[in-house]
Regions:
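Beta-strand-rich interaction surfaces with strong enrichment in secreted/lumenal proteins
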Residues: 136-138, 286-291
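Active-site/ligand-binding surface loops and adjacent short beta/alpha elements
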Residues: 159-161, 169-249
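Beta-strand-rich N-terminal accessory domains
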Residues: 1-69, 74-75, 81-84, 226-251, ...
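A short, structured loop/turn motif at beta-sheet edges
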Residues: 39-42, 108-115, 140-145, 174-179, ...
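C-terminal or internal capping secondary-structure element at the end of a domain, subdomain, or sheet
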Residues: 145, 156, 289, 295-306
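Acidic, contiguous internal or C-terminal segments within carbohydrate-active enzymes
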Residues: 15, 26, 39, 121-168, ...
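Extended, loop-rich substrate-binding clefts of extracytoplasmic carbohydrate-active enzymes
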Residues: 1-7, 88-143
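Acidic/His-leaning functional-site neighborhoods
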Residues: 94-109, 212-286
Length: 306
């Protein structure tokens, strides 16, 4: 069931699918805000964290839900200078995580199982990512899962670079009597990297296929060169897993990335973030994708409760 409601002084949309409720602000960042699930005993479990107070005038700074990262994920650099990217035309500004998460969208379609929204780049975004394109966010909601597809449609005459991603703020720990150290993430065989202060990728050779969320070493670590396009996490012991999988419309990509990040030791969330590639993709060309004129590319992510 799809309804519109007032929430935190904003008019938002809500989808109910079986035991799941999805709270969304399609016009502001195409932002999935919350995902709740009603348990068998009538209690409600928060899957995606959303703060009790949110300043929508600073949407890019709200720590919750799933910010859309476009055209590039995380920090961009130009010859070591933060906040710029290596465009085909040379040095241009690029904020952390791009423009979409704080940008305006137009709701193109709302159906019983989800919606499609189109990015409306402002003057700054048009100047600094100067291409002719349509960027769509398509969410499909299910009883115990969601699928989100990012599509870049090139309507111009030159190829367009991109390396988009997601910033899921998962509620963790989600049991009142457990701590972070009781949860673990299972990764496919992969390599770990960190980004230095000039935008270079430095290999972290401590990465393991099973990592504990209580281990500070996984915070702000980029996992890439993944042997499979999937991962899962949950309480040690194998119950109540959250599973993620991803794919490109244009085939497997060696530099797909999964980043793990949180803010503080006592933050109510831990972010598990599927990206099309590592940060600073435009300069390193690792995980950089190109869309030819009059074609489109899509990146689909599925999150499922196990």
């Amino acid at each position: 069931m799809h309804t519109e409601i007032a929430h935190q002084s904003e008019q938002i949309h809500r989808w109910q699918r079986g035991p799941s409720t999805f709270w969304v602000h399609p016009e502001k960042g195409a932002r999935l805000m919350r995902w709740d699930i009603e348990m068998a005993d009538g209690s409600v479990r928060e899957i995606l964290h959303w703060p009790d107070q949110a300043d929508w005038s600073q949407a890019g700074k709200i720590r919750g839900g799933n910010p859309i990262l476009f055209p590039f994920s995380a920090r961009s650099f130009f010859k070591g200078e933060l906040g710029y990217w290596k465009s085909p035309q040379g040095k241009r500004p690029m904020p952390n995580h791009g423009y979409a998460r704080q940008g305006a969208f137009q709701l193109e379609n709302a159906a019983a199982d989800g919606f499609i929204a189109r990015f409306l780049p402002d003057t700054e975004a048009q100047a600094n990512y100067p291409f002719d394109y349509n960027f769509f966010v398509d969410y499909r909601f299910h009883d115990l899962a969601l699928e989100v597809t990012l599509t870049l449609e090139n309507t111009g005459t030159e190829q367009i670079p991109w390396s988009a991603g997601h910033h899921f703020y998962f509620n963790l720990p989600w049991h009142a009597d457990l701590e972070r150290s009781h949860y673990e993430i299972h990764l496919p065989k992969c390599k770990g990297f960190r980004q230095d202060t000039r935008g270079n990728l430095l290999e972290d050779k401590t990465v393991q296929q099973v990592e504990n969320f209580g281990n500070d070493a996984i915070n702000d670590r980029i996992h890439t060169k993944l042997k499979r396009p999937d991962a899962k996490f949950g309480p040690a012991g194998g119950e109540e897993w959250i599973q993620l999988s991803w794919e490109d419309s244009h085939g497997p990509a060696a530099w797909h990335a999964l980043t793990t990040w949180t803010d503080q030791h006592d933050s109510l969330f831990y972010c598990v973030e599927p990206w099309m590639g590592p940060p600073n993709a435009a300069e390193t060309e690792k995980g950089l994708h190109w869309v030819a004129p009059n074609t489109s590319q899509s990146y689909r992510v599925r999150v499922e409760l196990g």
